[in-house]
């Protein structure tokens, strides 16, 4: 059975509010601001092509990177180094969180616990992947995602962050068998 969580219009404005700390500025300013803070973060998770590319440009290597070769719904070819570790490809349509994406993120954290680095390449869209990336993350994980036209958001995963993401997931529309 095909199951996915679909973003209802009523949640769109809520998702525009940063879940963590907003680091404002044009590229590369936000990345340079957080570089020293993130140098010893483990695990470090990036969501988005521009975020992953720029974190790598400042010399950091995320343990888990989730991206879709798009930015703001336009094709984008990020300059992302190949990963020494595991590459997972998963389908996830825009505005959704699919069961395969959830499973891929859960598997990625399991692989991270065994010292592997993981890149998840999404065929479709990864914009909502921050939600399950926080839900499945161990407490203390650092998750970074982009805030369009503003900068980047830095999340230090806590139980409170997990509760907020779980609340958002519960408010999403559950679709079975594509109906």
Curated annotation (Swiss-Prot):
Its EC number is 2.7.1.237. The keyword GTP-binding applies. Pathway: Cofactor biosynthesis; coenzyme A biosynthesis. GO terms for molecular function: GTP binding; kinase activity. It catalyses: 3'-dephospho-CoA + GTP = GDP + CoA + H(+). The keyword Kinase applies. InterPro entries: deph_CoA_kin_Thcocales (IPR054930), GTP-dep_dephospho-CoA_kin (IPR007164). Keywords: Coenzyme A biosynthesis, GTP-binding, Kinase, Nucleotide-binding, Transferase. One of its GO terms (biological process) is coenzyme A biosynthetic process. GTP binds at residues 49-51, 68, 70, 126. It comes from the Archaea. Pfam families: DUF359 (PF04019). It is an enzyme of class 2 (transferase). PANTHER family: GTP-DEPENDENT DEPHOSPHO-COA KINASE (PTHR40732:SF1), UPF0218 PROTEIN TK1697 (PTHR40732). Catalyzes the GTP-dependent phosphorylation of the 3'-hydroxyl group of dephosphocoenzyme A to form coenzyme A (CoA). Belongs to the GTP-dependent DPCK family. This is GTP-dependent dephospho-CoA kinase. It comes from Pyrococcus abyssi (strain GE5 / Orsay). The lineage of its organism: Archaea, Methanobacteriati, Methanobacteriota, Thermococci, Thermococcales.
């Amino acid at each position: 059975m095909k199951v996915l969580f679909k973003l209802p219009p009523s949640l769109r404005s809520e998702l525009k509010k940063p879940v963590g700390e907003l680091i404002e500025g044009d590229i590369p300013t936000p990345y340079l601001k957080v570089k020293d803070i993130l140098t010893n973060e483990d695990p470090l998770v990036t969501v988005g092509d521009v975020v992953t590319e720029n974190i790598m440009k400042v010399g950091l290597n995320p343990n888990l990177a989730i991206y879709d070769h798009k930015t703001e719904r336009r094709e984008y070819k990020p300059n992302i180094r190949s990963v020494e570790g595991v590459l997972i490809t998963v389908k996830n349509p825009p505005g959704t969180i699919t069961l395969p994406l959830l499973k891929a993120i859960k598997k990625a954290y399991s692989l991270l616990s065994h010292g592997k680095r993981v890149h998840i390449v999404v065929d479709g869209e990864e914009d909502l992947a921050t939600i399950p990336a926080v839900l499945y993350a161990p407490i203390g994980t650092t998750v970074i995602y982009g805030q369009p036209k503003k900068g980047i958001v830095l999340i230090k995963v806590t139980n409170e962050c997990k509760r907020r993401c779980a609340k958002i997931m519960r408010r999403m529309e559950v679709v079975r068998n594509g109906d």
